From Swiss-Prot:
The lineage of its organism: Bacteria, Pseudomonadati, Pseudomonadota, Gammaproteobacteria, Enterobacterales. This is tRNA U34 carboxymethyltransferase. Belongs to the class I-like SAM-binding methyltransferase superfamily. CmoB family. Disulfide bonds: none annotated. GO terms for biological process: tRNA wobble uridine modification. Carboxy-S-adenosyl-L-methionine binds at residues 91, 105, 110, 130, 181-182, 196, 200, 315. Pfam families: Methyltransf_9.
Length: 323
């Protein structure tokens, strides 16, 4: 079973220590009552991975680990078999001892769009909400973050993160917890909070913005990346049953509307840092994620529209500060 004791000890003497009033009980209850039916299978794959310590680790330009001398072909094959037991891999890519995990999303492209616009992460304590497999947590560590904490209730993502951590030498600078943001107390302890690819899944987007704000220190920075539509500050798309085949998409504002929402929630220095159309090169079917992807979610005759007739995915990055 995944143990969280190292994380508890890590935060016990710092600004996150009040979290320990409820966190151990929450995670104990999760382990008793909420495990996914496939969790034991996933965790078994993690346990059967070798504990490797890379001789070369690059978290700055990617997530890459190498060993000298290199691992044997047999070791690499065994490692690949265990990692394939954790499919589908959605966020990455990862390059591990000669094995390339080509994930559905080129999350490195998103990072390249985000990084130039944010405050330097060196020495910061960071929260990544909806962190997935934790790819961006490792990139945050690569930028010098003191501690990167990810939360995501999807248990496969937790196992994927622990698998990567094991192959990176058990690195304790990044951690993933199987929680949603609504389960966090108002910690007001993170220097930077990221919410990337989450807002449109929330039934109450303004509540989500307040939840993010409540995790930030005074003068802390919010990095918000989400789907948007074209339009002025009054433009918001409320999809019907599905958007790009996703059922749980509730509100897609324009970037100016989202800026107004952030200001309404009390954020200051709000700016629209980047906007980019999602392409079928950035999100696609791969050998590590073999089901449908963006190409199947767009109108086959007009890629400017989804199969439902809505505007195709356009993503924006907004930066804001908690006063």
């Amino acid at each position: 079973m995944i143990e969280f004791g190292d994380f508890y000890r890590l935060i016990a003497k710092g600004p996150l220590s009040p979290w320990l009033d409820i966190l151990p009980a929450q995670l104990s209850a999760w382990q008793r009552e909420s495990l996914h039916g496939k969790f034991k299978t996933w965790f078994n794959a993690v346990e059967h991975l070798p504990q490797l310590t890379p001789t070369t680790l690059d978290l700055h330009s990617g997530v890459r680990a190498e060993m000298s001398p290199p691992i044997s072909a047999g070791q690499r094959e065994g490692m690949e078999n265990m990692l394939r037991a954790l499919m589908p891999w959605r966020k990455g890519p990862f390059s591990l001892y000669g094995l390339e995990i080509d994930t559905e999303w080129r999350s490195d492209w998103k990072w390249q769009r985000v990084l130039p616009h944010i405050s330097p992460l060196a020495g910061r304590t960071i929260l990544d909400v909806g962190c997935g497999s934790g790819y961006h947590l490792w990139r945050m560590i690569g930028e010098g973050a003191h501690l990167a904490v990810g939360i995501d209730p999807m248990q496969l993502f937790l196992c994927q993160f622990e698998a990567i951590r094991k192959l990176l030498g058990g690195d304790q600078r990044a951690h993933v917890l199987p929680l949603g943001i609504e389960q966090l107390p108002e910690l007001a302890a993170f220097d930077t909070v990221f919410s990337m690819g989450v807002l449109y899944h929330r039934r109450s987007p303004l509540d989500h913005l307040y939840q993010l704000k409540n995790q930030l220190v005074t003068d802390g920075e919010l990095v918000l990346e989400t789907l948007v539509v074209e339009g002025d500050s009054q433009q918001v798309l409320v999809p019907g049953d599905r958007y790009a085949q996703m059922r749980n998409v509730y509100f897609i504002p324009s970037a100016p509307a989202l800026k107004a929402w952030l200001e309404k929630c009390g954020f200051v220095d709000v700016r629209i840092a980047d906007m980019a159309v999602t392409t079928t090169e950035e999100q696609r079917r791969t050998d590590w994620m073999t089901s449908e992807s963006l190409a199947e979610f767009l109108d086959p005759h007009d890629h400017s529209k989804t199969v439902e007739g809505y505007p195709a995915p356009l993503r924006a990055v907004l930066i804001a500060r908690k006063p």
